[in-house]
Amino acid sequence: MHLSPQEKDKLLIFSAALLAERRLSRGLKLNYPETVAFLSFQVLEGARDGKSVSQLMSEGTTWLSKSQVMEGIPEMVDEVQIEAVFPDGTKLVTIHNPIN
């Protein structure tokens, strides 16, 4: 199987996001890489599902709360940017202050 660098990145994000989801379901708080992977995966899947950039930017602030991440993470993750493939092409999605 031959994968492009972008496809490899998406698989890595998926693996880390899956781990993050499992840890959340066990009541554990997410660290920095898990938090970024979780948010990035939500954007990638939302784009795949046909959501718009503005929808994802708005919804992105509701996916995680401060109680779900380790202390200091909300301050470290003040913005998440990820390129996602939409029906009309690749676009950069930026979520400002994603953890409330």
From Swiss-Prot:
GO molecular function, one term: urease activity
Subcellular location field: Cytoplasm
Keyword tags: Cytoplasm, Hydrolase
Record field: catalytic activity: urea + 2 H2O + H(+) = hydrogencarbonate + 2 NH4(+)
Pathway noted in the entry: Nitrogen metabolism; urea degradation; CO(2) and NH(3) from urea (urease route): step 1/1
Annotated GO biological process: urea catabolic process
Family that this chain belongs to: Belongs to the urease gamma subunit family.
PANTHER family: UREASE
Subunit structure: Heterotrimer of UreA (gamma), UreB (beta) and UreC (alpha) subunits. Three heterotrimers associate to form the active enzyme.
Protein name: Urease subunit gamma
Natural source organism: Prochlorococcus marinus (strain MIT 9301)
Encoding gene (name): ureA
